[in-house]
Amino acid sequence: MMENYKHTTVLLDEAVNGLNIRPDGTYIDGTFGRGGHSRLILSQLGEEGRLLAIDRDPQAIAVAKTIDDPRFSIIHGPFSALGEYVAERDLIGKIDGILLDLGVSSPQLDDAERGFSFMRDGPLDMRMDPTRGQSAAEWLQTAEEADIAWVLKTYGEERFAKRIARAIVERNREQPMTRTKELAEVVAAATPVKDKFKHPATRTFQAVRIWVNSELEEIEQALKSSLNVLAPGGRLSIISFHSLEDRIVKRFMRENSRGPQVPAGLPMTEEQLKKLGGRQLRALGKLMPGEEEVAENPRARSSVLRIAERTNA
């Protein structure tokens, strides 16, 4: 049961400090989870402050609904739609900070019934919102071998992607897989060289989860929307847990922290340069967890926090 989980929020203070909270500000926690970041943000807001939280996991929504605070509201949906949520509330350009804690949460991993983990046998599901879309089992049973291989290679950086994809398709022809343990066993058997520090199914489970939940597309859309909804001086505080996520965040902040790229020697008037606009973000750097936090919470090891500020451009 979800109430039994003790969830340790990674980079809790650092991520919230990165928002540079104003007591009367309006903030978004795009990944409510079990509410660690939201509760800390609320503790720093005054009576006029406001926090809008988002999550697509029904279990997270159930936890959020226990917060009885007039400054707080929760939306059940993907954070990629934050632009729509903000527009509906007439808050475009008025958001003082957005926090995103990307990837799968510890409660999701630890609950066998959610199907995210190869360490616990459960239904082969992996959906952040189990009420929407295809489960991992449904997708693996209907996808072409080449498509599965592409997903494993692209989202899991799995070097044995083709071999594993073939084994998955062959197994599903014999008897459709419906359990996480079955997929983990098929992947392990199809992996010719084992990494002694990592379970052979690690990359496959990551890849399938990312694909089923459109995770990278969700991140890209949310980042794009953030430029429209943030007020000048508003902050982005984003925690990523693997290189694919961090690459997207790093590239977005870098590209939007530069001014317009005009080829050298190209004649342009001041009016034309104004239309191109200036830089929209100021990157404020990155933070990683210290040794003490990693010792207390090993899952924090790969996390990276990146912070940026919306400019007046």
Swiss-Prot record:
Key word Methyltransferase present: yes
EC main group: transferase
Disulfide cysteine pairs (residue numbers): none
GO biological process assignments: rRNA base methylation
Binding site for S-adenosyl-L-methionine: 35-37, 55, 79, 101, 108
GO molecular function: rRNA (cytosine-N4-)-methyltransferase activity
Catalytic activity: cytidine(1402) in 16S rRNA + S-adenosyl-L-methionine = N(4)-methylcytidine(1402) in 16S rRNA + S-adenosyl-L-homocysteine + H(+)
Alphabetical keyword list: Cytoplasm, Methyltransferase, rRNA processing, S-adenosyl-L-methionine, Transferase
Transmembrane segments: none
One GO CC term, this protein: cytoplasm
Chief site of localization: cytoplasm
E.C. no: 2.1.1.199
Subcellular locations according to the entry: Cytoplasm
Pfam families from the UniProt entry: Methyltransf_5
Domain of life: Bacteria
Cited HAMAP family: 16SrRNA_methyltr_H
Similarity comment: family membership: Belongs to the methyltransferase superfamily. RsmH family.
Function: Specifically methylates the N4 position of cytidine in position 1402 (C1402) of 16S rRNA.
Name by which UniProt lists this protein: Ribosomal RNA small subunit methyltransferase H
Organism: Escherichia coli O81 (strain ED1a)
Encoding gene, per UniProt annotation: rsmH
